[in-house]
Amino acid sequence: GTPLPIWRSEEGEEICIGSVEELYNEIEKSVAAGFMKSNPLKDQGFVPGNMSQENYDKIDLHRPYVDYIILVSQSGKPMKREADLIDVWFDSGSMPYAQIHYPFENQDAIDKKKAFPADFINEGVDQTRGWFFTLHAIATMIFDSVAFKNVISSGLVLDAKGNKMSKHVGNVVNPFDMIEKYGTDAVRLYMMTNSEPWDNLKFDPEGVDEVRRKFFGTLYNTYSFFALYANVDGFEPGQQQIDFAKRPEIDRWILSCLNTLIKKVTAELENYDPTRAGRLIDAFVNNDLSNWYVRLNRKRFWGKEMSDDKRSAYETLYTCLMTVSRLLAPFAPFYSDQLYRDLGGEKDSVHLDAYPTADEALIDADLEARMEMAQQITSMVLALRRKVNIKVRQPLQSIMIPATAEQKRHIEAVKDLILNEVNVKELNFVEGAGILVKKVKCNFRTMGKKFGKLMKGVAAQMSGLSQEQIADLENKGIPADRKSVV
């Protein structure tokens, strides 16, 4: 522990030392008064005012050495140091100042608030009465200020069944075994995206393996597809770029999604929510980039000549992969760096490059909406085929879709794409909802954020909505005043 820097005489006189230089000078007075034979700081070569690490390495102010120092009071009496030590939480709470040697150096960092209060800190929930408290306590006493602006109090890591890990029970998961088996990035991304950091995490090795296969495997395969054909064609990014406005709609769509992704990920990170940010990247890579864009555009990479259409496909996919490598860097620092360098990034490392910023001019919300409609309808039709065991290769005459006027507009724009994907000849709209019975299924994760403790009451009411009420809800949405729905 840190010795209390207080010396007191038997008569009650005392002095609180505020710096090593002050202690040095007080020892000199004690030597002159005959209470000390010599100044141990001077004997060890310490030079007051020299803030170098080398200078401070010469002395040790821990016990028992500091207890040998006798000071002299103003009345000429000997003073001995108080025997108590400062609680270690005082040391921890002094971190913002001690780490920069304030107030002896770097005064502007604290006084002009360049590095204080901290933007963000993170520790386990057990630190609520420890570090979190002492940081604020000391900052309030000294500066009448909070010590930090944002905090994430991490939950506990439990086993896959939600039980506390225990060596006695035998359910402890060795993190080094997980890293060795699945890789550091897979473990990191799993832990960040599986649950919010402030919630307890049910750690399941199968979940880590799923992240490794479904996310990193998909991203690697997407890069491999690009690299295979790019190397054959001698594609060089940045040469003879196709103007954005002249690119096919599918290219403009994925680039719009990419820039929307940048906006959303940045917003979530600035809001200190890495879980939602990581899930957004995962959804883009798996759903939009791999399962939709690359799958629908494979043939564009197969042509023998480097046509404008083929070059546009290369440029678009390259931009997506390069941007994802930079977006992914905080979540998966190793693979993102590998991907960045494989793509020929300008910097020596992705971590030396700037984090992506969205280009608003490339975002087309209307285009994204109608393509999302195509994805949803395709997914539902294919799911229905699987349910009734009708293979995709077997053509069907028509599909019937209930839709609002706005939805019809979007669907008409991507009608041919949908029909081709699901192998159906006609797409017809259902007028009215007479033949449909709709049910409300609540997304509790989303509702929890919106309604909090009111969520159960809202869910109970929504489960009992009539067909007319459901239609009204679809058209008008949930009221802004959340209490009005309870």
Question: Where is each model-derived feature located?
Answer:
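Short Ser/Thr-interspersed hydrophobic loop/turn segments at strand-loop and sheet-helix junctions
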Residues: 134-141
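Feature 926 captures the class I aminoacyl-tRNA synthetase adenylation module centered on the KMSKS loop
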Residues: 1-90, 94-96, 102, 142-180, ...
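A short glycine/serine-rich beta->alpha loop
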Residues: 115-127
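Cytochrome P450 heme-binding Cys-pocket and its upstream "meander" loop
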Residues: 101-112
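Residues forming anionic-ligand binding surfaces in small-molecule and nucleic-acid pockets
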Residues: 114-115, 263
